[in-house]
């Protein structure tokens, strides 16, 4: 089984350093099509069974209403499952760009068994769960701040301990080359 996980940064193109981010910052308001096409070409070449997509635009003004998960699913022949990354009671869902920010998983099953859960802390709380290829695949995007990220990790460890089927936890863990990452 081949799995790919990619933070696509809303299809804005990945800046190479903070100076480049300043020059390309306008892409966060109107994403060019080229980076998303390049991501699709990459996935076509790799041919993964499961694709986890973080920072996916689900149809905001930035993409002229285009759902990036649907576009990449069309390019790969996989089925998209996507959810908004903020909890249903989040005030961010009332804002045009934020209400269309999500995460997605692309799988071969035509009617995948999927669910959205939410961590109890942080801004990005989504825990996207999909059963595919004989496993339960969890996709998360952890907090930027260390204390909140640690709370999320503890919550995930406790919550996923009860999962009795084979599983994979994947995502953007925002570790920034930390040397004190603990494995258990």
Would you name each region that the model predicts?
Residues 55-134:
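Structured beta-strand-rich core segments of catalytic domains in phosphoester-bond hydrolases
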Residues 45-47, 134, 161:
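Alpha-helix termination/capping residues and helix-transition junctions
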Residues 22-29, 56-58, 115-118, 138-147:
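Surface-exposed cleft-lining segments at the edges of enzyme active sites
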Residues 6, 54, 140, 170-172:
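Active-site flanking residues adjacent to catalytic metal/cofactor-binding acidic residues
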Residues 50, 135-136, 166-168:
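Structural motif
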């Amino acid at each position: 089984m081949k799995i790919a996980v990619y933070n696509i940064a809303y299809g804005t193109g990945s800046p190479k350093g903070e100076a480049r981010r300043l020059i390309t910052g306008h892409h966060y308001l109107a994403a060019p099509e080229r980076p998303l096409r390049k991501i699709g070409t990459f996935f076509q070449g790799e041919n993964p069974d499961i694709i986890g997509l973080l920072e996916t635009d689900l149809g905001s003004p930035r993409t002229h209403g285009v759902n990036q998960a649907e576009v990449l699913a069309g390019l790969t022949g996989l089925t998209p499952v996507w959810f908004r990354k903020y909890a249903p009671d989040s005030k961010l869902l009332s804002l045009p760009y934020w209400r269309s920010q999500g995460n997605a998983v692309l799988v071969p099953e035509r009617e995948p068994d999927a669910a959205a859960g939410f961590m109890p802390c942080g801004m990005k709380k989504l825990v996207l769960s999909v059963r595919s290829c004989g496993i339960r695949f969890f996709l998360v995007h952890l907090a930027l701040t260390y204390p909140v990220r640690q709370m999320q990790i503890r919550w995930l460890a406790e919550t996923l301990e009860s999962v009795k089927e084979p599983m994979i936890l994947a995502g953007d863990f925002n570790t920034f080359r930390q040397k004190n990452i603990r494995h258990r």
